[in-house]
Design a protein with these regions (language model features):
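Structural preference for beta-strand elements that scaffold enzyme active sites
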Residues: 7-11, 27-28
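Intrinsically disordered, low-complexity regions
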Residues: 5-7, 117
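Structured C-terminal cap/extension of enzyme domains
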Residues: 16-118
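Distinct, well-ordered alpha-helical segments
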Residues: 1-3
Length: 118
């Protein structure tokens, strides 16, 4: 199946749906995950485009805990927190954004470590 039919390019905007959107004819991603795992996000797409759908799917599944943690609070709070945890210097929050709940921050830190980016 193909979405867009060559008239419009479709990009996945949900990190938990990269492979399904590509399978429907999507051409790429607009991704929160790519801020903390750019190489891995690129590889998910590249494997798919190279015909390694199973490998792409497995990488997508491997990223699911991190994807879920990156959206456990209002965006962009988790991704900014993740970047700060990674030493990327994303800075302090400005109103109306605030720090993550402690339990969610611990969940995010664990997901980053488990995924190998922290």
């Amino acid at each position: 199946a193909a979405i867009g039919q060559g008239v419009v390019d479709i990009y996945s905007g949900n990190d938990d749906q990269i492979v399904p959107i590509l399978a429907l004819g999507g051409v790429g991603v607009i991704s929160v995950l790519s801020n903390v795992a750019p190489t891995q996000t690129h590889e998910i797409c590249q494997k798919f485009f190279d015909g390694d759908v199973a490998g792409s799917r497995q990488m997508q599944l491997d990223a699911m805990d991190l994807c879920n943690a990156l959206f456990c609070e209002v965006n962009p709070i988790p991704v900014k927190t993740a970047l700060n945890m990674m030493g990327m210097g994303a800075g302090a929050f400005r109103m109306p954004l605030c720090e993550m709940e402690e339990a969610n921050a611990k969940r995010l830190e664990k997901a980053l470590k488990d995924y190998g980016v922290l």
